[in-house]
């Protein structure tokens, strides 16, 4: 920026030509009031030239004849108060061709020529009569034409201000002598409100070979007395607001300080950024800097008092229609380029904008916003900003009835900005404004995973609270909407993200308080999670960790504690493996005497006495019960060599004290304790007891057997039964030990992949138990014998399903074996890319395989027979993959032709079929086989 060194005289003017300021002077920089009060002249300096005296009354309004001249401060205040009505009065004066009572001055010919030049329309060769230089009823002497009605057309400042920025000494190659300026679009503003700033280092006048700009803007800065601009990129000029009369005001161009040219920053008034033009908000000189905004946005400056003229309704409507019809606002580069061009580049492209630069034009809302206070971020807001607005929370929506953008970075508009996992948000109510639901929901599908896109209903059920919900941590699942209110509104992006940034930060935190397979949480979490009265099982499946509350009651088992040789009954130092369990000598002798003496011990308390080194002799009933639960049997092999594998096998038989509330516990214990000494005692492992207790109740199909069977009615009844069984599977999985330790997406994926296997496996078990495999026992009210199978339209499918109960009859599967195999079916199919909680999944699956081995050992004696039994049962699980694949294919074909076949499919079942069955049939899942084919 050229330094203002002196104030020279007015440059000579050629009659009939445009005004010609000297090279190096600012465009409309107003000098001090001294040179304008007299006609004295001085030597002309080459660097700075003042504005011609003939333009003094034009560019800076003077009082008309008959009025006392006011001081500059009073005149400024009057000008500001007349901003609202100045535009209409000037237009009325121009339209009626009104005249002023002021007599023409001595240079009236020159003034008329300048006015004709200034008021000339944008087309060449057109002119119009000059309005009067001054009017008594208004402090504004000149206004330009209205804003154009057509949005693509150039603003009115193009034709009004171009002659002002021209020189008489222009080169022939220059076009109208316009200044070279780059377009800098403030963030959040449409192109129709863009400002023009000269780039740093570029010539300010048309004498240099620069590219003409189609929209030059009039710039005027009022400096304080005695202040000089030392640097072109220095601080912004500060001063009091002052009204600008003349063509600059008429053009409606926003004022830009000269210091902003180097930085490339265009500042606009606060209300201008929201298109709320009728209200003029002036920045006070000592206003504090707003948090989250750039210093340039809060620096006090002289806005040169450009009147904020109202936009044309046609222009605003066209811009609104353009924003609504554009297809590039989907979070990509188009959104970044349209709303936030970089400051340093004159050509706003798709370059991502820095986060700190975004809030310059996104001002925080007013304390009491009006209904029309935020039209920019209202109904015609692009979807990229809509997503951000939907996530702002209930507080923001309660303060303002209209949506607006809070100052800050918009992650939807800046895809390259690394974001951590967003905190989960509660489900939002449906939008109140028409058309908002479609705009908000459309781009949300891009961030939804394949498993979760169709699992909204499953997720609602998984999140459904039963009794007192577990304590929610920082990543606890948000509550879902009430059942029966339609689809689940829970946003999938409310879950912890698995993006690269989240992976770099570390492993994703658990969604739930981590539960072990024994129903107990890990250390540091509260324990009441499973249903009341369920048995607690032994802890080997969670690295042998127990809650803090039981740390003093019993030892904590881990590999570090193995060398201590701890007794698994009382926690004392173990002397060896006695009767099959690692125990101390005291517990060994106690168990032998109790079993051989046939003592009938009774607990004086509630069968939950603490058994440790100090209190192990207080209650012999609880001590003997703990010995039996640990797996101590008379005649067990003794070994004194502490091998890790053998110790782990011994630790697998450890059990915690059972809680109160299990029915017939005392009777069962008394029966066990009165066995003869030579009889072998076989105790069911506690985890299998837990699986028995959480087994779902009987489910009815609701089929009307009084009417003759038709294909559509039979298939519809089977679908209704499948919907109820799917709900039962979800509830059962929530109670399954270890399942809720997995990621919520993994839980939904496993249920969606295995629901058909679980249903047909349960069908085989019911058919085997109730009708000995002679019929298909779907439900108590829907049993198909062979005759009804032949009459149905899916007889071949019934024959396929009939193979399962026949295998059960052949193998004589026990209930314990069935329950363990059922859990393994839930864990038998995973995605090709694996699960998010793959490590926890593998540990859980290995644990239930060990439980199956224990269930086999309850009936089979000997290693050979147990191994053969394990092979037969696992081979049956492998063969189920091919059988279920046929069911998947038939189910998908029926679902596609459901209208033609008049078959009804319930909502949740339809979601799973439409989303997952094509993926399963296409081989996009990985079956986990026990044996190679």
UniProtKB/Swiss-Prot annotation:
There is a cross-link at residues 388, 531 (Glycyl lysine isopeptide (Lys-Gly) (interchain with G-Cter in SUMO)). Residues 1-164 are annotated as: AF3. Residues 1-256, 328-380, 415-452 are annotated as: Disordered. Residues 1-566 are annotated as: Modulating, Pro-Rich. The keyword Phosphoprotein applies. The modification Phosphoserine is found at residues 20, 81, 130, 162, 190, 213, 294, 345, 400. A motif (LXXL motif 1) lies at residues 55-59. Residues 165-305 are annotated as: Mediates transcriptional transrepression. Residues 418-433 have a biased composition (Pro residues). It is found in: Nucleus; Cytoplasm. It holds the Pfam family zf-C4. This is Progesterone receptor. It comes from Papio anubis (Olive baboon).
């Amino acid at each position: 920026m050229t330094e203002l060194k002196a104030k020279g005289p007015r440059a000579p003017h050629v009659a009939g030509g445009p005004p010609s300021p000297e090279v190096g002077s600012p465009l409309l920089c107003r000098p001090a009031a001294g040179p304008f009060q007299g006609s004295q002249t001085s030597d002309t300096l080459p660097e700075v030239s003042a504005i011609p005296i003939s333009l003094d009354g034009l560019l800076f309004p003077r009082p008309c004849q008959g009025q006392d001249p006011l001081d500059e401060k009073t005149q400024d205040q009057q000008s500001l108060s007349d901003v609202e009505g100045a535009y209409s009065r000037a237009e009325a004066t121009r339209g009626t061709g009104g005249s002023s009572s002021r007599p023409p001055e001595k240079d009236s010919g020159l003034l008329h020529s300048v006015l004709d030049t200034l008021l000339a329309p944008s087309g060449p060769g057109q002119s119009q009569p000059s309005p009067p230089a001054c009017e008594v009823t208004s402090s504004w002497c000149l206004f330009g034409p209205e804003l154009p009605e057509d949005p693509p057309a150039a603003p009115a400042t193009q034709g009004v201000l171009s002659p002002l920025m021209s020189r008489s000494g222009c080169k022939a190659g220059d076009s109208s002598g316009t200044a070279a300026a780059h377009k800098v679009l403030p963030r959040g503003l449409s192109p129709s409100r863009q400002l023009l700033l000269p780039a740093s280092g570029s010539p300010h006048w048309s004498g240099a070979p620069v590219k003409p700009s189609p929209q030059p803007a009039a710039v005027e800065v009022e400096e304080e007395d005695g202040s000089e601009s030392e640097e072109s990129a220095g601080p912004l000029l500060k001063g009091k607001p002052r009204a600008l009369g003349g063509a600059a005001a008429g053009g409606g161009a926003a004022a830009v300080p000269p210091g902003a040219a180097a930085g490339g920053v265009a500042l606009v008034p606060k209300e201008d950024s929201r298109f709320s033009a009728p209200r003029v908000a002036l920045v006070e000189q000592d206003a504090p800097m707003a948090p989250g905004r750039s210093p340039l946005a809060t620096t006090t400056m002289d806005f040169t008092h450009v009147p904020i003229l109202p936009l044309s309704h046609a222009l605003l409507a066209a811009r609104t229609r353009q924003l609504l019809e554009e297809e590039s606002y989907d979070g990509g580069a188009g959104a970044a380029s349209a709303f936030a061009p970089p400051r340093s580049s004159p050509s706003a492209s798709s370059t991502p904008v820095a986060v700190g630069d975004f809030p310059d034009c996104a001002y925080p809302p007013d304390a009491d916003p009006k209904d029309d206070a935020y039209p920019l971020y209202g109904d015609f807001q692009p979807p990229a900003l809509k997503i951000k607005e939907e996530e702002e929370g209930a507080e923001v929506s309660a303060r303002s009835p209209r949506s607006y953008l809070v100052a800050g970075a918009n992650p939807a508009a800046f895809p390259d900005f690394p974001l951590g996992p967003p905190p989960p948000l509660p489900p939002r109510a449906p939008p109140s404004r028409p058309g908002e639901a479609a705009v908000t929901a459309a781009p949300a599908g891009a961030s939804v995973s394949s498993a979760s896109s169709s699992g909204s209903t499953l997720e609602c059920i998984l999140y459904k609270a039963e009794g007192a919900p577990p304590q929610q941590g920082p990543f606890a699942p948000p509550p879902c909407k009430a059942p029966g209110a339609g689809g689940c509104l829970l946003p999938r992006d409310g879950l912890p993200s698995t993006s690269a940034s989240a992976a770099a930060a570390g492993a994703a935190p658990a969604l739930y308080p981590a539960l072990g397979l024994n129903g107990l949480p890990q250390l540091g979490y509260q324990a009441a999670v499973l249903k009341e009265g369920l048995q607690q099982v032994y802890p080997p499946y969670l690295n042998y960790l127990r809650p803090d509350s039981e740390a003093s009651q019993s030892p904590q088992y881990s590999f570090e504690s193995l060398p201590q040789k701890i007794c698994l009954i009382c926690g004392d130092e173990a002397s060896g493996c006695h009767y099959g369990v690692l125990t101390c000598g005291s517990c060994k002798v106690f168990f032998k005497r109790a079993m051989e003496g046939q003592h009938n011990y009774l607990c004086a308390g509630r069968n939950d006495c603490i058994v440790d080194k100090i209190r192990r002799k207080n209650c012999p009933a609880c001590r003997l019960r703990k010995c039996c639960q640990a797996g101590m049997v008379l005649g067990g092999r003794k070994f004194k060599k502490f091998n890790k594998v053998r110790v782990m096998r011994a630790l697998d038989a450890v059990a915690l004290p059972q809680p109160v509330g299990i029915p017939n516990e005392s009777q069962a214990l008394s029966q066990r304790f009165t066995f003869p000494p030579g009889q072998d005692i076989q105790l069911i492992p506690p985890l299998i007891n837990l699986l028995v207790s959480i087994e779902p109740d009987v489910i009815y199909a609701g089929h009307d057997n009084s009417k003759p069977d038709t294909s559509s009615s039979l298939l519809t009844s089977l679908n209704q039964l499948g919907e109820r069984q799917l709900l039962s599977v979800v509830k059962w999985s929530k109670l399954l030990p270890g399942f809720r330790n997995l990621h919520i997406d993994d839980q939904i994926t496993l249920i969606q992949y295995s629901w058909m296997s679980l249903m047909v496996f349960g069908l085989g078990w019911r058919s085997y138990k109730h009708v000995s495999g002679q019929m298909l026992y779907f439900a108590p009210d829907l049993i198909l014998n062979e005759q009804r199978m032949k009459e149905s339209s899916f007889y071949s499918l019934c024959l396929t399903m009939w193979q399962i109960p026949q295998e059960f009859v052949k193998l004589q599967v026990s209930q314990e074996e069935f329950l363990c195999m059922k859990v393994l079916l839930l864990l038998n199919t995973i995605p090709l890319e694996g699960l998010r909680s793959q490590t926890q999944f593998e540990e859980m699956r290995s644990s239930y395989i060990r439980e199956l081995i224990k269930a086999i050992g309850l009936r089979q004696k000997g290693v050979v027979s147990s191994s053969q039994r394990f092979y037969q049962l696992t081979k049956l699980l492998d063969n189920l993959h091919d059988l279920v694949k046929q069911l998947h294919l038939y189910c998908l074909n029926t679902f596609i032709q459901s209208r033609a076949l008049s078959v009804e499919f319930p909502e949740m079942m339809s979601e799973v079929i439409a989303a997952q069955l094509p993926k399963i049939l296409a081989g996009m899942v990985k079956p986990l086989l026990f044996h190679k084919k």
